[in-house]
Amino acid sequence: MIRPQTFKAILVFVANDISGGEDDRTPGEVLKLYRILVRQIRVRNPDTPVFWIETTPTPSRWHATGRIRTANRKIRRYCDRNPDLYFIGTHEAFTGPEGTPDSTLFRSDMLHLNRDGYRLWAELIKQSLSEEGILP
C-alpha cells in the first residue's frame, strides 16, 4: 500500500464513506477502517505522524452531518489516545454563525471546495503540521 519511503507525515482524508446514501458505512465502520489503515501504515512507517483531516461539512451532505460528526468524534478520540496520530479539525472553519456550512467556500455542486475553500483547508493543514514541527 505504501512503498518503502521515509515520510515526514502522512495525511488521510476520507469523505465518501458517509454521504447520505443507502450504502453508507456506519461511524463505527469508518473508525474500524481507519484503524486498519493505521496498522498498515505502521508496518513500514512505525514512527511517522499520521494526520486525519476531519471530514469537512458540505451543504450537499448536510443531511448526513449527524453520522459524519459521530465518525469524526470517534476518530478524534482514537487519535487523542494513540501516539503520533493527529486530528485536523475543519468543522468550525467551514461553518457559519448558524452552524451550517458556509456555501461561499464551495463550488456550485455544494460538495467540492472552491479556490477559497481549498485555501482555508490548506491553511488548517499547514497550521497543524507546523504545530507538530513538521513544517517550519
Labelled PLM ranges:
Residues 1-136:
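Alpha-helical cap/lid subdomain in secreted, periplasmic
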